[in-house]
Amino acid sequence: MTATKDLQGARAAQAKRNKELITRYYDLALNQKDFAAARQYIGPYYRQHSTYGADGPEGLGAFVEWAKVNIPNMHVDFVRIIADGDYVLMHNRGKNSPGTKAVVDIFRIENGKVVEHWDVLQDVPETAKNANSMF
């Protein structure tokens, strides 16, 4: 029973660390658009599955520089964050002028660094066929 509790405690601690790491990383990279500060959280190889960026830390750096120029007012609100082992999922509200997007980002962490990223984005319409929020 103690070994099971120890394992559960270790997993919970890992999930907490991973969620904190992704929250710091994402805020620096996307909200503050500070790649130099966000770089410390990226592994030596960063595999990008999003069509918006290239592989490698340099790919993320190029995207952040592009965002500074093309979407300078973009801000992401973290709605929920879920961790499962080496994976962290974020459900976000991406605010930009004009429009808002519902975003799901998935990150894989290895040795305390972000090494892989996927995303899915959807415009938030003015009206919907139901009264349910996308968030």
Where are the predicted features?
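C-terminal and inter-domain tail/linker signature
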Residues: M1-F135
